[in-house]
């Protein structure tokens, strides 16, 4: 399973700002969107193109457009919503397929409570977005759901990933490609990524924060 850690200077700079314990909700939210957009650039750089002709100012001109399967963006609720605008700024025509997954804070097991998928998801590339890949439970549950719905080409895009989460996805779904801004050190005893970003959902939505 390919894992791409995108170490672009702009991404490294913005991710460093996001790691601050005292970051404001406004700044965290804006940076999540910006890093999401930058990761989207990398995650879509191998999309196929086809040529076509248009009328130009000096006569007909041959240009290119994306061909093949269209894309559906799959935010894992709730934190994935924080990356959505950044992703859609680059692929505004993509359909959005929302998946709600809750993690039991004691067992760390994932439970799916919502799925609103694009009706033609089997004919689309699925791009899952979530700020954190920690234990991997939510990601694996989402991929399970998408494959059951007929999705065959799936990629995952996260801001930070723990080695444990990457390994969980690799074991369950070795065909899924992961793009991340950082592979962090480890998980702590509570399942939080170290050094991580803290609770990304709380920081995006302005609710109670937990530092990790």
From Swiss-Prot:
<dbReference type="GO" id="GO:0044206">
    <property type="term" value="P:UMP salvage"/>
</dbReference>
<feature type="binding site">
    <location>
        <position position="199"/>
    </location>
    <ligand>
        <name>5-phospho-alpha-D-ribose 1-diphosphate</name>
    </ligand>
</feature>
<dbReference type="GO" id="GO:0005829">
    <property type="term" value="C:cytosol"/>
</dbReference>
<protein>
    <recommendedName>
        <fullName>Uracil phosphoribosyltransferase</fullName>
        <ecNumber>2.4.2.9</ecNumber>
    </recommendedName>
</protein>
<dbReference type="GO" id="GO:0000287">
    <property type="term" value="F:magnesium ion binding"/>
</dbReference>
<keyword id="KW-0460">Magnesium</keyword>
<feature type="binding site">
    <location>
        <position position="78"/>
    </location>
    <ligand>
        <name>5-phospho-alpha-D-ribose 1-diphosphate</name>
    </ligand>
</feature>
<feature type="binding site">
    <location>
        <begin position="198"/>
        <end position="200"/>
    </location>
    <ligand>
        <name>uracil</name>
    </ligand>
</feature>
<dbReference type="InterPro" id="IPR000836">
    <property type="entry name" value="PRibTrfase_dom"/>
</dbReference>
<comment type="similarity">
    <text>Belongs to the UPRTase family.</text>
</comment>
<keyword id="KW-0328">Glycosyltransferase</keyword>
<dbReference type="GO" id="GO:0006223">
    <property type="term" value="P:uracil salvage"/>
</dbReference>
<feature type="binding site">
    <location>
        <position position="103"/>
    </location>
    <ligand>
        <name>5-phospho-alpha-D-ribose 1-diphosphate</name>
    </ligand>
</feature>
<dbReference type="GO" id="GO:0005525">
    <property type="term" value="F:GTP binding"/>
</dbReference>
<comment type="function">
    <text>Catalyzes the conversion of uracil and 5-phospho-alpha-D-ribose 1-diphosphate (PRPP) to UMP and diphosphate.</text>
</comment>
<keyword id="KW-0342">GTP-binding</keyword>
<dbReference type="GO" id="GO:0005737">
    <property type="term" value="C:cytoplasm"/>
</dbReference>
<feature type="binding site">
    <location>
        <position position="193"/>
    </location>
    <ligand>
        <name>uracil</name>
    </ligand>
</feature>
<dbReference type="GO" id="GO:0004845">
    <property type="term" value="F:uracil phosphoribosyltransferase activity"/>
</dbReference>
<keyword id="KW-0547">Nucleotide-binding</keyword>
<dbReference type="InterPro" id="IPR050054">
    <property type="entry name" value="UPRTase/APRTase"/>
</dbReference>
<keyword id="KW-0808">Transferase</keyword>
<dbReference type="InterPro" id="IPR034332">
    <property type="entry name" value="Upp_B"/>
</dbReference>
<comment type="pathway">
    <text>Pyrimidine metabolism; UMP biosynthesis via salvage pathway; UMP from uracil: step 1/1.</text>
</comment>
<keyword id="KW-0021">Allosteric enzyme</keyword>
<dbReference type="InterPro" id="IPR029057">
    <property type="entry name" value="PRTase-like"/>
</dbReference>
<dbReference type="InterPro" id="IPR005765">
    <property type="entry name" value="Ura_phspho_trans"/>
</dbReference>
<dbReference type="Pfam" id="PF14681">
    <property type="entry name" value="UPRTase"/>
</dbReference>
<feature type="binding site">
    <location>
        <begin position="130"/>
        <end position="138"/>
    </location>
    <ligand>
        <name>5-phospho-alpha-D-ribose 1-diphosphate</name>
    </ligand>
</feature>
